């Protein structure tokens, strides 16, 4: 019988995010201040974003640690199954192995909570410090 789904055990879930910028030859240009057309500073961005989110956005480090609290929330619905698309492979008559992530198993049925959870975490962390 062919294996259709691969489910990563909880013990093997990532504890760090991979930052693709670290491997880019041509790194993205910094965001510009619309008034001055100059690169924005962390201080200017602090009016819109939590400090840790800004640091990550501007980081060139290859890996960024995922806070344990975020990892615990991820474990509620992850890991999402990696599914082999045998039917598509056959229809395309390709020797390639085609896989897709089935994000429908998450509470909202998509990947959006994967970024929403850490954004909310950092916003709550920094706003509760200021309160």
Language model features with spans:
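Extracytoplasmic/secretory-pathway segments with low complexity and glycosylation-like composition
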Residues: 1-3
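Positively charged, low-complexity intrinsically disordered leader regions
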Residues: 10-23, 27, 35, 48-121
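Glycine-rich phosphate/pyrophosphate-binding loop at beta-loop-alpha junctions
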Residues: 30
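Conserved small/polar residues in nucleotide/adenosyl-binding loops
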Residues: 126-131
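Glycine-rich nucleotide/cofactor/substrate-binding loop typically near the N-terminus or early
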Residues: 33, 37, 41, 45-46
């Amino acid at each position: 019988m062919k294996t259709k789904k691969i489910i990563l055990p909880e013990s093997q879930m990532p504890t760090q995010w991979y930052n693709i910028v670290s491997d880019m030859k041509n790194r993205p240009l910094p965001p510009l201040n619309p008034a001055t057309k100059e690169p924005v500073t962390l201080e200017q961005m602090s009016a819109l974003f939590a400090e840790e989110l800004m640091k990550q956005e501007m980081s060139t480090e290859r890996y960024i640690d995922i806070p344990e609290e975020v990892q615990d929330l991820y474990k509620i619905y992850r890991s999402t199954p990696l599914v082999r698309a045998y039917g598509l492979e056959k229809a395309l008559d390709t020797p390639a192995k085609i896989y897709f992530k089935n994000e429908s198993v998450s509470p909202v049925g998509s990947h959006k909570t994967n970024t929403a959870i850490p954004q909310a975490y950092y916003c709550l962390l920094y706003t509760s410090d200021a309160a």
